[in-house]
Regions:
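Charged, often glycine-rich, active-site loop that binds/positions anionic groups
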Residues: 1-8, 116-120
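Helix-loop-strand module that forms the ligand-binding subsite of alpha/beta enzymes
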Residues: 5-109
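Glycine-rich phosphate/pyrophosphate-binding loop and the adjoining helix
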Residues: 94, 99-160
Length: 160
């Protein structure tokens, strides 16, 4: 972090730097992860680790403070790690002092989980790898939560 400059958030030269610049510029940050072994994916964990430049960097210090964060998870089953994945994403937002608005209408206090493992009439899982598109409740909850996040971000922008 000591080598950070206004134009260079991270000393590691890779394709994350342009993404980190977009994260710094956003008003609403939506992080979505698949659920693997009752937790967020390793790729998402690595990405979150790279955002430490916004908390501990000399030029990016608290760059995400006051921005709005939305946590989403996609899992095969409704209750096999959705909550822990959402909690990890939510925790990252809190470390950055971001706002994570709940949406009671969506039943979303920490984010939204969408189920990809849909069952047939015999309660047997279908083999559809795009089953998340059939989770109407989950997708509608995502829509409501994102609308709430945008509403909060607009309100914050108007107050500045």
């Amino acid at each position: 972090m000591s080598k950070q400059t206004p134009d260079k958030l991270c000393a590691i030269e890779d394709d994350a730097n342009p993404i980190l610049e977009k994260v710094r510029a956003c008003d609403v940050l939506i992080l979505a992860s698949p659920v693997y072994f009752s937790r967020l994916s390793g790729t998402m964990a690595c990405f979150i680790d790279r955002t430490r430049c916004f908390t501990f960097g000399k030029n990016g210090h608290l760059a995400l403070k006051g921005k709005v964060g939305v946590a989403l998870a996609v899992g095969w089953c409704r209750n096999l790690g959705m909550e822990t994945t959402l909690a990890s994403l939510h925790g990252a937002f809190l470390v950055h002092e971001m706002l994570t608005p709940p949406c009671h209408a969506a039943g979303a206090l920490y984010g939204v989980g969408v189920v990809s493992g849909q069952r047939d009439e015999n309660f047997i899982y279908k083999r559809d790898k795009l089953g998340a598109k059939d989770d109407q409740e989950g997708l509608y909850s995502v829509k409501l939560l994102v609308q709430e996040a945008v509403r909060v971000a607009k309100k914050l922008t108007n107050e500045r």
